[in-house]
Amino acid sequence: SMYDHPFQWGSERTGPDLARVGGRYSDAWHVQHLKDPRSVVPESIMPTYAFLADTDLDLNDASAKLRALKDVGVPYSNKDIADAVLDMKAQADPNADARDLMKRYPKAQQRDFDGNPGRLTEMDALVAYLQVLGTMVDVNAAAAQEDLATERGR
C-alpha cells in the first residue's frame, strides 16, 4: 500500500506479492489458508496461523496506532482516530449500524470475516486487511503521476 513503511529499504521479502490480493479469494479461502496453508496451496512453505482464530483482537490501543500513522503521513481524520474501536467492531459485525463507518470509508467491507460471528479475532482483522489490499488504488491518479514525471524528465 502507498502508506506502508518498510523497516528497511532493500530488505529481503519472502513470499508472494500481496499488493493486489484483495477480492481475489473468498474469506473462507483466506481463513483456510491461514489455518492450514498446504490444504489450499500444496507447495506452500508458509507456517500455520491457526492461533489467530483463537486470539481476541486487542482493541485497547487502536486509536493510538491511528494517531501514530497520522503522524507519519497517513490521512486519518480526528474522527477516524476517535472512532477507531467502534469502526473495527462495526466492520466485523454484519448486523451493526455502519453508516458512519461507510461514510468515512466508502470502500470498507462489512461482514464477519473469519466465520465466527460471536468473536472479534485477529483472524477477522487479518482477513479484512488482506481483502482490502490493492482495492483502493486509483489507477488513473497513478497514471497521471507517471505522465507528469515523464513530462518533467524523471
Regions found by a protein language model. Give the residues of each.
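Periplasmic c-type cytochrome electron-transfer domains
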Residues: 1-154
